[in-house]
């Protein structure tokens, strides 16, 4: 390459522990030698979040709103042990949750597939992208133990002072039990629908929404009706032009269909279903280290990409002691490529789009050529059978990727 590609504005968020080390290596070896970015950096490391009373996380989210593209390194969400370890002022909330609450949108998880990494579900040759509606339902419910006989009722009191409406949930006649009231909001469901339709158009894959509307006729029926109405009014012609489709499916039918499919579709899930199915699907593809996570906002313009895994604390402890590590950087690399690909799409920047695609191809081709980290070697051979010659350490693997990227870009004569 004779000159660097002009990349435009990107918000990058640094993270914690081993992924922070890898994040710097990705920039140094794979991004900065080839792409000139207008980079807006925010340090979301746990110490800086504590020093700024978590203001840095909010600032980063506002910057993503402004520039439309964010790439995020994995971060620590502190528990009691972490509060003690870092002497934190308080147990700060998950940065992902804070950013999601500010931006809105839906998180889509997608597997990165290599031919030589075995999958538990061998028929899945293309990714299944799960979009989880991470709002409401059981996660914002009010639940309680019913101590003894009596009625549980739900009452709706209109703000305009008109008559209340009361529904009987259950009449407990013989002893107590448990009860729960949960909700969702039309606006949130509409945003979920728009994000899902935008994602399907962006990938060129069909979209399925799963509910249990045969049982929850009003509750799940609302999800089904809102999706259908938005699809018919705003997206149907675009879907037909791309020869893709949208369908509603019952959750049990959808689970069965997903297992026997070859993949290659978007699956929009309600909150609980998405929580369960995203982990189930991730395991089916073989490795969480090979899973991307992209937050897509309802406008289709604003995107934040990150790895779907944590900060790899165990490897970081080894690294601190000067011991060798073999940490998989692929999901973090794909956070960058998905962010850059979206920047390229917004700016109609063909060179940047080519670069993002080339880096993804190099990552997969390198693994398929037999150069990989220890976790992937373990997927192929089983951990007890892995020898040192089967894998590269963290830094060797990054060097190998850098070497292969250089060759690919030189051949492309960009």
From Swiss-Prot:
Q: Which reaction(s) does the protein catalyse, per the Swiss-Prot or TrEMBL entry?
A: D-threo-isocitrate + NADP(+) = 2-oxoglutarate + CO2 + NADPH
Question: What PANTHER family does the annotation carry?
Answer: ISOCITRATE DEHYDROGENASE [NADP] CYTOPLASMIC, NADP-SPECIFIC ISOCITRATE DEHYDROGENASE
Q: What is known about its subunit structure?
A: Homodimer.
Q: Which residues carry this modification: N-acetylserine?
A: 2
Establish whether keyword Repeat is in the entry.
no
Residues bound to substrate are: 77, 94-100, 109, 132, 212
Q: Which residues carry this modification: Phosphotyrosine?
A: 42
Disulfide bonding pattern of the chain: none
The entry's family comment says: Belongs to the isocitrate and isopropylmalate dehydrogenases family.
Write down which residues bear the modification named Phosphoserine: 389
Q: Which residues bind NADP(+)?
A: 75-77, 82, 260, 310-315, 328
Q: In which organism is this protein found?
A: Homo sapiens
Q: Name one GO molecular function term.
A: identical protein binding
Name the UniProt record assigns to this protein: Isocitrate dehydrogenase [NADP] cytoplasmic
**Linked disorder?**
Glioma: Gliomas are benign or malignant central nervous system neoplasms derived from glial cells. They comprise astrocytomas and glioblastoma multiforme that are derived from astrocytes, oligodendrogliomas derived from oligodendrocytes and ependymomas derived from ependymocytes. Genetic variations are associated with cartilaginous tumors such as enchondroma or chondrosarcoma. Mutations of Arg-132 to Cys, Gly or His abolish the conversion of isocitrate to alpha-ketoglutarate. Instead, alpha-ketoglutarate is converted to R(-)-2-hydroxyglutarate.
The UniProt function text for this chain reads: Catalyzes the NADP(+)-dependent oxidative decarboxylation of isocitrate (D-threo-isocitrate) to 2-ketoglutarate (2-oxoglutarate), which is required by other enzymes such as the phytanoyl-CoA dioxygenase. Plays a critical role in the generation of NADPH, an important cofactor in many biosynthesis pathways. May act as a corneal epithelial crystallin and may be involved in maintaining corneal epithelial transparency.
Q: What is its main location?
A: cytoplasm
- PTM annotation (N6-acetyllysine): residues: 81, 224, 233, 243, 321
